[in-house]
């Protein structure tokens, strides 16, 4: 190696390269790690040095050299690369490795306009000094490389134009805690700040992207997902697209319910004009969604919902595929098809489904969600009424078209609207659930707006976070984590701004939360359980019972302190009905685990004191945030032991947690013989979860005789999901062979899904 190379320092001066210095930094970064070779990293990086190289480029070269060595056999390179990257990050942010005092840092950032000046109004210098004693900057060293790159790319406060970074991770965590608990009484709030900081900085609670990147800055919109319902008038359609633009510009993903829009050829103003149908308006929504990237963090994304019995359904199901022409395709949104028991019954009996325009059949659209018996009565009545425009189609043909499009695009989602309303925290007669969100885990009431400032409409917001099951050693720990997650997210509802009155009204009235889980695959591996063989069923029952019980208990305690949410009377909880009362009883055949908690005492306490939050749980995908915690994604099985995530900051390799000890215990996605075991687990989770679950179906064509997945199998899995009370189905993944060779040259590549995911956490 040429010792005479000149390097250019950060201040512009030059000096001879100091290889000893590089060696010392590598030595420091490798301390306590297994099976990492410093000389390997040095060799790989030295060949890339050149005369006049900047010290920052030297640093980046070394980091990259270490990251390239991450593999199944040497997973600890992900920590070596991470420590080097943290060193580099802190140099960039602070000009030195040691972070400054918290108070000095906050003063400087507020002066620069990077942090919210409320921080200095809410807390004294003394309190900041106390918070400084809570911080453990060494926790930075527990990040994996993928986590540091995600922090750098998405979460740390920065100038996205120049690439300057202004903070490191522990300041992010303590200041999120400080902002969220700023309105708590002076005497208790620092204790909450410390407890919450400890839970998030040790990865026990995972926070969603909008909270991580936004809380502490002057932008105060942190809902991950927004649900907007559209009426069947031009005013409502325009109000919907205005609301979409407002929220997409503020980092949110969108769920649109466009199911009320009348069909092509319907009369307008008593026949004065001829309706252009749904597609032009869907295009209008697509343009609104794509008009802004999500606050510089993600591209806009939306899922649009419509009922299976809509007169135009055959044209709507194909909107995403690659055939057709620009005029009859709207490819840059995803779609959710809404189904209920009557549709499935027609399929099973080999009968027809009759398609209508919602505008021609009074009361039918509302009954589809609010009252299943009334829906069936009206539906059969309208089928017999010859004066109503309609079209009959064989149920099997319609379901097959839907499943074919789901298989080919992967992005046609399913919402079982009857399950969403019969096993719901809301009374469907007063507050029916008529749609879901971008990633299908949210199920909340909405009402169409007539204009963007309409006070009577309701936009639903989902405020998310998750428990990291991999970091939990006993279910008792969930009690404290539930208290912290519920209190922090509930405080967030008051802390954030609402760009649209209809959103503020719903958020303040219902105070809905969606707390989920990450690292479920690691949790199963640790307990020696598998997805596919039923061995995890009872453990899953016990775990999700504990999660929902402790969340309800925390919200009930908060209601005693701060009052129940104003619209508590619209929930089924107000009538003393709990998830354990309304679940699909078919689940009893696959999980015989008894209930372990005192639900009856909780029921009485909820009837007496109410709940602070109308909903508490939802199981969301978590591609990005689980990388921060070095966890597996949500409830999903991993595709490979090493995953490669393509993010805008390059290729990130991540090894599943504790691979060295547990590699035989993990069940990989494509090792599962089918979807049955997974769908059973989702059904068991849904017994307790009050909103919904982003559940995927997965198919490996090579497992079938002709190398093609038979339609019969797709329909069977759809019916299995319905049977076990599954409310929603998200992606359909088909194995294509390229992504899963498990040598380290071709690890599984995963994109960040849903346009880099928004109601993912």
Set out the residue ranges of the language-model regions.
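Core nucleic-acid recognition elements
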Residues: 1-3, 13, 36-174, 178, ...
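Alpha-helix capping and helix-loop boundary segments enriched in small/acidic/polar residues
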Residues: 13-17, 164-167, 187-191, 211-217, ...
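A glycine-rich phosphate-binding loop feature that marks nucleotide/adenosyl-phosphate handling sites
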Residues: 44, 63-65, 79-87, 199, ...
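Terminal amphipathic helices with adjacent charged low-complexity linkers/tails
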Residues: 77-113, 149, 339-341, 420-451, ...
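Catalytic alpha/beta core of large soluble enzyme barrels
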Residues: 124-150, 440-446, 489-494, 591-596, ...
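Function-dense linear segments that define catalytic or interfacial modules
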Residues: 157, 164, 171-189, 193, ...
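Internal maturation/activation junctions in enzymes
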Residues: 199, 482-504, 508, 530-622, ...
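Polar, glycine-rich mid-to-C-terminal structural blocks
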Residues: 318, 327, 331-409, 417
